[in-house]
Amino acid sequence: MTPNSASAAPSRRSFLASSAVAAAAVAGGLPLLAACGGSDGGSGGGTTSGKDAKKLLPSYVANNVVTPDIPARNGSAVGFTGPLDLAGLKTSVPKKLGAGGKVTIMSPFWGSPPKQDNAYYRGMNDLIGVDVVWQNQDGNTYEQKLGAVLASSSVPDVVVIPGWNMGGKIPSAITGKFADLGPYLSGDKVKEYPNLAAIPTDAWQRCIFGGKLRGLPMPASCVTNIVPFYRKDIFDQEGYELPCSADEFMALAKDITNARAKRWACLDMKWTAFNVFGVLSGSEKPLGWELVDGKLIYRVETQEYLEALEWTRKLFAAGYAHPDAELGKSAQTDAGPKFAAGEFLIYNDDISQWYSRTAEQAAQNPDFKISGMDVFGHDGGAPTLWATQPANIFAFVSKKAPESVVRDVLAVADVTAAPYGTKEYMLTNYGVEGTHYTVENGVPVKNDKGNNEVINAYVMVASPAATVAHPDFPDVARAQVEWQQRMGAVTRKSSFYGMQIAEPSRWTNLSNDFEQLEDDIVRGHKKISDMQQAVSDWKGKGGDRLRDWYKKLLDDNGPAAG
């Protein structure tokens, strides 16, 4: 069984879903360094986008080394559905770009880091022509480590920072500690690194901090990653029809549920409800704002938000949700076993589970078939979905690094950003053939050494455009990408899509309590009126002033999506 070889960059939620890791708490203790543009009375925060960003961005040059079986469309990933042919692998980096220097990289790591001088690291360093030395840090406490390192005078050559670790003063520290890569990558300069030139422009825009191009991105599809999964085999067997409206879903849930027979319709469907009712994205705070009739509105202020919560509450109140869902997030266990056992037939989670659930059940439960419902509009019409960010993990180069080190880092990135179907991609993602993996019937299979050594390292320096490839389950790869394409066709970009925004520190925690209140409301522990009061309190505690701050940002910079 091959690991999930989708290279789509994760949001915090999808990364947690696929890696079962916990993000660190917000750390403090950093000096407030040079803030981004558009600051408010010294409180920090701001962005560079729209009019000013274009001159900073690298030129986009499509990579024609490999042709995907399914091209990207409507913000989807590219897809590959054929068997892997080692003999047919292409070369995307024909000569070593590295000059043989040493580069230290600090990165989050989940699990036990491999020894420094292992076969995978040696193979990668030899291919690139750079001696990469890893400073792996526990991903669960990474933000605290970042705070200490960025506050010190000793910063590694490269530091990887996921978007979910950019709390507190870290965005302003990024501006103060890391180099401007524009002189190496802006405009046509990027053509020296063809794989970096093939990274989508939206992903590069997310790399602008403090008015400079400072990051190297891990690109992602901008289509929602939350899929309403269902047991297609049981649906077919029972004759259930897929719902096309919120009312039809409720009726279907009633038909499915039989508590005496230990079968329920679903788990907590709140995330899907937000999509069904067209609620602005909650994946990152700036995405929750939208200009409506000249006024910026935050997602929690909308009628759609309340309607989505009320609809989800009704699912729970009617007893259609599995008892496990009543426990809430903190007590939830892995949904897989009970989904496989048919205790519930629908749940929503990250799109990566389309593959992982299929792979889990392939041998022991050959009749098992998972599929994803298309998101429907609550009233039976087309839904309105909102784009997620096109990159959310970044690598930064120290300001103190000499040009030779910057060039060596870019040499690393040009290899790690190689597309699927190349020798560079296979080495980056699977290691050395025969040492870390073998290919059986067109499917790469990692051995124990591969699973121990070839894990979340080089891919975090930079990655190719979002990619889905499952040679062991090509139908799943096709289904995932085609789902993204259909959902992408009804996806809109909100006012601050693609922008890298640091909110003023005094307001960064203002909306942190809404998620817990949502969960309490849908489970009947709180009322919709409690949310209305919380929104009123939010406005008074700074929400209205934050709105004014965002409006000035929009007036000064223009919308990123425009």
How would you name each of these model-derived features?
Residues 1-14, 23-31, 35:
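N-terminal secretory signal peptides
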Residues 36-45:
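Bacterial lipoprotein signal-peptidase II cleavage site
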Residues 79-91, 411-519, 525:
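Conserved small-residue motifs centered on glycine
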Residues 99-111, 130-135, 158, 214:
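Short, well-ordered beta-strand elements
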Residues 208-273, 289-332, 397-407, 414-423, ...:
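Helix-loop-helix "hinge/cap" segment bordering the ligand-binding cleft or interdomain interface
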